[in-house]
Design a protein with these regions (language model features):
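General helical secondary-structure elements
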Residues: 71, 77, 160, 232, ...
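Nucleotide-sugar donor-binding/catalytic module of glycosyltransferases
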Residues: 1-237, 246
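Catalytic core of nucleotide-sugar-dependent glycosyltransferases
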Residues: 209-215, 221-252, 270-293
């Protein structure tokens, strides 16, 4: 009997002490045997790594296939994922966040589907997990690249890496990296670019991954500081820019992809808006081509459309007047 292909599982670790034991146990207890685990500790300042090492000790049959990469300083989730990819040796690559967990048949089911269908990318449904239970999130957006790209740009398809499996040979051929230093929406941008590189996409109508939504210490949940939040918004703009340029270079920035991309760009630059005029001027010069989506984007209110229209025409005074009159 031929040996099953090796799967590399990449798990960035950052301040996940209350959750990481459950994550690690769910990965170690997979029904699939041939797994290489790469944990990338991005300089956590809690005891995540200690808990990780203690938990791994409970699985001696897996321990030889575990590698822990420790950053001497925080480098961000994008670089952590790139470091994991650089160290990967498996035929397939999967990802998990250290505060989430998976069902025991996840790897086996995804790899079997990829092998049978000769897929470069396989994605599946997932659970949003709350303290009072799970919510099933369906992800059936087909297996055609254009449809998948548009669904991801519109944020209908989740842009995460963790509900997807990738053939590593394809990743090497595609040559796409996470954008170092741009740690917001880095997974969405990466997945959009990869979907543009292959027609061999598979989908499984079943959920295995539990996306934990009650970790108040996660990076997304803790974006409260204004300066930090603005920096993250600029990182999002950078990821959107890299991905849209790539789609344009591939000749895909037309028709429904172009329309979806412009809405994606508009939503990214809208996050730059703050109370100061500098942020408004930054909005004006960021993705000006996306302004045509102002009156086609169903995700913004009529009042906000009018405000954006004033900015499009460089009428900051009228923007402030409307804000004053409407109180918002």
């Amino acid at each position: 009997m031929m040996a099953k292909p090796v799967v590399t599982y990449i798990i960035p670790v950052y301040n996940a002490e209350p959750f990481i034991e459950r994550c690690v146990r769910s990965l170690m207890e997979q029904s699939y045997a041939n797994i290489e685990y790469i944990f990338v500790d991005d300089c956590s300042f809690d005891c995540s790594t200690d808990v990780l090492r203690r938990t791994i000790d409970d699985y001696p049959e897996r321990k030889a296939n575990v590698r822990i990469i420790a950053h001497s300083a925080g480098r961000g989730s994008a670089t952590s994922r790139n470091d994991g990819l650089d160290a990967a040796k498996g035929e397939y690559v999967m990802f998990a966040d250290s505060d989430d967990y998976v069902d025991s048949d996840y790897v086996e089911t995804m790899v079997n589907h990829a092998e049978i269908g000769q897929c470069d990318i396989v994605y599946c449904d997932f659970y949003e997990t709350y303290q009072d239970g799970d919510r099933l999130i369906r992800q059936d957006y087909g297996t055609q690249p254009i449809g998948c790209i548009c669904s991801m740009l519109s944020r209908a398809m989740h842009g995460s890496t963790w509900n997807k499996t990738f053939r590593r040979k394809f990743l090497l051929h595609a040559g796409q990296r996470f954008v170092d230093g741009a740690d917001l929406f880095e997974d969405v941008g990466w997945n959009v670019r990869l979907m543009a590189c292959t027609p061999r996409i598979g989908y499984i109508s079943k959920a295995f991954y539990h996306y934990v939504k009650y970790n108040s210490g996660s990076i997304i949940a803790s974006m409260t500081d204004k300066a930090y939040s603005r920096m993250r918004c600029l990182q999002r703009v950078r990821n959107v820019d890299v991905s849209c340029r790539f789609l344009d270079e591939r000749g895909l920035m037309r028709g429904e992809v172009r329309r979806a991309a412009h809405i994606w760009m508009l939503m990214a630059k809208n996050d730059l808006i703050a109370a100061d005029d500098y942020s408004l001027k930054r909005w004006m010069v960021t993705f000006p081509e996306a302004d045509e989506a102002i009156w086609h984007c169903g995700q913004i209110t009529l009042n906000f459309r009018l405000l954006l229209t004033w900015l499009h025409y460089r009428c900051i005074g009228l923007y402030h007047l409307q804000k004053l009159l409407t109180g918002r």
